[in-house]
Regions:
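FAD-dinucleotide binding site
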Residues: 1-434
Length: 434
């Protein structure tokens, strides 16, 4: 049995390991558009010397349930518990102060969003909560600190359906684990073990941009660059943004259910920047995450210093704010953040070393992680809620994986892992049966 995998992220790597464990598999070809393993798990180790800046996935979530915990241990990657607290940084009559995220006015907004979610999630096609009529600091903070806000979902509460989030599996309640050398480095190291452990059965093709997938009942033929590859089955793990914009042509066209799913499954926006500090500012305590409102474009920065790397200041933006920042030159974004943080905090000075992400403009990603968009229709319309399962359904010998196909923990690395494993098991079952 000869199988192709498109995409070298966590889903593709998990699929490869699962397939290669079966003695009936004679060849596994992994085609990756970039020159590396990892997908949206990517660590930058050069922009800030001595610091591993995770540009995508930040940490191992639900460590007792997440396969990456065991992989990190096996590959000798040290981890550190997050153990974070969260605070607001606000300007008051007495100057700048650090306040609890449960400030009454902010908590009232959070409670409103929760009540809206509780009610709206009873129907399959209703948004979490409406867009605020006025964009004021209290509203920005409320949406930023809500568990349904953009820092969790990469989309705003008025952009995605509540019922999709309501299916999310309960986590283990344990602290997230930072990977000291970077979670992207961990995933890359895991992928790089495939060839040494599998010999000639495994072939990796980096820089292979797949442009067409032709399939029938018995085989799949991939076209990439000026080459083609025919296999017994193919697992597609590329992001829904790439599938949805027609970058890969399917012959014949995918069924209506898949095409409709790709209209509502989208990638949100999430942005990170990191700057090396020249000083150790007393207003930014390592291990504390602070929320700081920005006026133009309106949004919220989430910034912090890591206990194990307290000489670097990291800032996040999400949702519409991140999308607006992604449209600006990097130099303007750095200037915007530096001006704001130095206004809000004393003693913040920077030295050489900085890094920034822009997933919106990454050709192989075109966004952060998935959400199920509200695109209209009545509250009882079931189609959007069916999108993740619809996309995960095989089409003859073509199988789909990736975090967007997992309803229970979408948007996470473990979702990508489980989906890749699931698709590989389905390939083995179906081809053996045939």
């Amino acid at each position: 049995m000869k199988v192709a995998i498109i995409g070298g992220g966590v889903a593709g790597i998990a699929a490869a390991y699962t397939l290669l464990a079966d003695k009936n598999v004679t060849a596994v070809h992994l085609l990756e558009a970039t020159g590396r393993y990892g997908g949206r798990a990517r660590t930058d180790t050069t922009s800030i010397p001595g610091f591993a800046f995770d540009k995508g996935a930040q940490y191992i979530q639900d460590p007792t349930l997440n396969p990456l915990t065991a992989i990190a241990k096996k590959l000798n990657f040290d981890t550190v518990e997050e153990d974070a607290v969260y605070r607001l940084r606000v300007e008051t009559e007495d100057g700048w102060e650090t306040l609890p995220t449960t400030e009454p006015q902010v908590q009232a907004v959070v409670d409103e969003i929760q009540a809206s979610f509780d009610e709206n999630s009873k129907k399959p096609n209703v948004i979490v909560a409406g867009k605020p009529r006025k964009i004021e600091e209290v509203q920005l903070f409320g949406h930023a600190t809500s568990t349904y806000g953009p820092f969790t979902e990469s989309a705003e509460t008025w952009q995605y359906i509540a019922a999709d989030r309501a299916r999310e599996a309960k986590g283990d309640g344990e602290e997230n684990l930072f990977v000291v050398k970077g979670i992207g480095s961990l995933v890359a190291a895991w992928g790089q073990k495939l060839r040494p452990t599998s010999g000639s059965t495994y072939v990796e093709h980096f820089g292979a941009v797949v442009s067409k997938i032709a399939y029938d009942d018995d085989k799949v033929t991939l076209t990439y660059d000026s080459q083609s590859l025919t296999v017994d089955a193919c697992i597609v793990t590329v992001p829904v943004s790439v599938l949805g914009d027609g970058s890969i042509a399917f012959e014949p066209a995918l069924p209506d259910a898949h095409r409709n799913a790709l209209k509502v499954l989208r990638l949100g926006s999430y942005k990170k920047l990191a700057l090396r500090l020249r000083t150790s500012p007393a207003d930014i305590v390592p291990g504390t995450n602070y929320y700081l409102a920005e006026d133009d474009p309106p949004g919220v920065w989430q910034y912090y210093r890591l206990p194990h790397a307290d000489d670097v200041l990291i800032a996040h933006a999400a949702g519409d704010f991140a999308a607006a920042l992604d449209r600006l030159p990097d130099s303007e974004v750095f200037k915007l953040f530096k001006t704001r943080i130095q206004t809000a905090c004393d003693g913040v000075f920077f030295t050489t070393g900085r890094a920034m992400t822009n997933w919106s403009n990454e050709p192989a990603a075109r966004g952060a992680y998935s959400y199920t968009a509200f695109t209209g229709g009545g509250p009882d319309d079931p189609n959007a809620l069916k999108a993740r399962d619809a996309l995960a359904t095989p089409v003859k010998r073509v199988y789909f994986a990736g975090e967007a196909t997992d309803p229970s923990c979408y948007g996470t690395l473990q979702a990508a892992y489980f989906s890749g494993e699931r698709a590989a098991v389905a390939v083995l079952h179906d081809v053996h049966a045939a």
